[in-house]
Amino acid sequence: MCDVTFHSNALNRDMQYRVVFPGHITAGERFPVVYLLHGGGGNFRNWSDWSDVARYAERGLILVMPEGSDSYWANSAGRPQDRYEDYVVNDLISDVEDKFSAAKDRANRAIVGVSMGGFGAVKLALSHPDLFAFAGGISSAIDVPRRPFSIKRPAQGLRHRLIFGAWGSQTRRDNDPYILVRFADPGRMPYLFLSCGEQEGLLRANREFAALLEERHLRYEFHVVPGGHTWTQWNERLPSLFDSMWKRIHPED
């Protein structure tokens, strides 16, 4: 495991990410890469500090955990310098593939997140289906661009307006996973793994999103599991997620 600092052109500043490697690497060998996005209020250390995700590297995976602040992993509508989507899909992937023994094709690339990161993982995969073969959203804040926070929670509404743009704006539509699915070509989309706890306020939105995936004939699976919105619960969902992922990404020939 190591922490990397690199310069992001999209953000015009240095950023950090954590990497976990397979235990045995031979010269010339390339490994699938899983990008793990943290949730709101978190940081790039959360995945390795609060879960046992590192053990899945032993399956022959490179795990990458980038810093994302509270960005929702989106290009901010109100702060042009905060282009977090571009940072991930352009700068981060390029840096990882330049520095490490990473496979460089879609079939060997996955993206996964929890909460805010679950939204980010699903949204980035739907927006860039040429980059990812698999996306996993655990307890995803999947409906956040369509929540009228400005009415009941003004401070949060202002922050979300800064990120996603005004209600009904094109930037908000561009960041709405429901709209992306509605106009998606099912044959081009990555496989989606969704999981949400029975005690979570996000369950209804995740059920609705899964129903839309079914309607649009996208490839997916959706699990409703016991528990709430905690790292303890998320850690328990990792075995089924990685088992599903392993069926859909593979090492380079």
Where are these predicted regions, by residue range?
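Non-catalytic cap/lid and distal C-terminal segments of serine-dependent acyl enzymes
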Residues: M1-D253
